[in-house]
Amino acid sequence: MNRPIVLLVEDETSVVAFIQSALERYGYCVEAAASGAQALEMLRDRSYSGVISDMRTPGGVDGAGVWSWIAGHRPELLRKLIFITGDIVNEETAATLRRTCAPFIEKPFRVHQLISTLEQVLGQRQ
């Protein structure tokens, strides 16, 4: 059986290492993009089972920009995107979460929260 491939959009290397290690322990393959712009390049070139994106990333394309691109180019991934954020009180972040209806996890989070949410959006149980 092929392992699900998840695109992780996160610029903090310690968070990337934490999430990648956790997801790999649960049988996922993780490819990381350090910016929203890099994520869009990767989404153009490869298929993913799901996407986990930080709301705030450098390079001019944030989590909302990744969501918008997916909506226009890879709509099959819209319901398979999870936002992670440390800033839900920010009005722009809150507005994006309301507009997209995408599931989100607030930093800091526990591994079981991430795995449970990922299993829900991918429609599988580990």
Over which residues does each language-model region extend?
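Acidic, metal-coordinating helix/loop segments flanking the phosphotransfer/catalytic sites
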Residues: L7, Q20, A32-G50, P58, ...
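Conserved acidic carboxylate
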Residues: E10
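Two-component/phosphorelay signaling modules centered on CheY-like receiver
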Residues: T13-E31, A102
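Short amphipathic alpha-helix used as the core "switch/output" element in two-component signaling
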Residues: E41, D62-L77
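Hydrophobic/aromatic residues positioned on beta-strands within the core alpha/beta folds
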Residues: I84-T85
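As written
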Residues: A95-I105
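C-terminal output helix
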Residues: F109-E119
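The C-terminal output helix
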Residues: E119-Q126
